[in-house]
Amino acid sequence: MSLARPTSIIPADQNRNLLGELRVRHPSWYYWTFAYTVLTVICLAAGLIDERNFQGVSVWDKPFKFALSIAVYFATLGWFANLMQPDYFNTLRGKLLTGVPVVCALLEMLYILVQGARGEPSHFNVSSPFYSVMYGLMGAGAALMVATCLWMGCSILRNRGTNDIWVLSVGIGLIGTFVLGGGVGFYLGGAEAHWVSGETTDAGGLPLVNWSRTGGDLRVAHFFGIHAMQVIPCVGALLVWLRQRNRIGHLGAQVCLTSVSLGFAAFCISTFIQALRGAPFI
């Protein structure tokens, strides 16, 4: 296996920064990353100005978190885009792969923004036929977004094989997001709330994430699951770095990546079981 610098991880043009490289790899997802980053800042500012609360936290807390999460989502997909087949995104399938998550994220974000601005819940809100339909559509959109990860992960592994550590880590991470994040998300969609026992408020939760400290919280497992697409490739990038410096062999890197991936999956499942038992994460 060549120890040459892997251009799939770093910019191919050393005169180009990371944002410039992302723009080259997938322009559409780059611009949506930028748009949701701006929206994240706007929601953060709105939360500082607007003193209204819902379930113990700012009404802008959920829009802020979702805008940030979607920005990271598109940045990640865009960074992996160069592992797809050449000109794949110019085909009908490629255009669908680009457009489906964009439309789903946009519609979901708009609804979350509107509900947040009104001080009304977007998730678990089935108080009227309209809200029930909207909640169902949000779930369908989220399912399509994680299905995009599955589609892309399988395509990358089929196109590039599993011998390259970086490629393998990307494939595992994307598929892991579908399995772990999507699996917990599916369960969440059928639940009445993200709390299991404990106080039904986000007030007093863990800093930044607001996870319950008085009972179980299903958002914990969902959070870690959907971020498999970042965690596992980061491990892969570290292993590539070690390979370049002859500090680990190819077989050792594969074993390490497999072990970490299985361990991460076990961790996500354990946090899910922990929440179901009504126990707080910390």
Residue ranges and their predicted role:
Residues 4-9, 71-86, 151-168, 191-200:
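Cytoplasmic juxtamembrane interface segments
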Residues 21-22, 127, 208-212:
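Helix-boundary and loop/linker segments of multi-pass membrane transporters
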Residues 28-48, 61-83, 99-116, 137-152, ...:
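Hydrophobic cores of alpha-helical transmembrane segments in multi-pass integral membrane proteins
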Residues 188-228:
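Membrane-interfacial catalytic/cofactor-binding modules of polytopic membrane enzymes
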Residues 1-25:
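Short, Lys/Arg-rich, polar N-terminal cytosolic tail immediately upstream
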Residues 90-97, 161-178, 240-264:
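Cytoplasmic juxtamembrane regions at transmembrane-helix boundaries
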Residues 89-104, 114-142, 148-170:
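Membrane-interface helix-loop-helix junctions at boundaries between adjacent transmembrane segments
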Residues 48-54, 58, 117-127, 195-196, ...:
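Interfacial helix-loop-helix junctions of multi-pass membrane proteins
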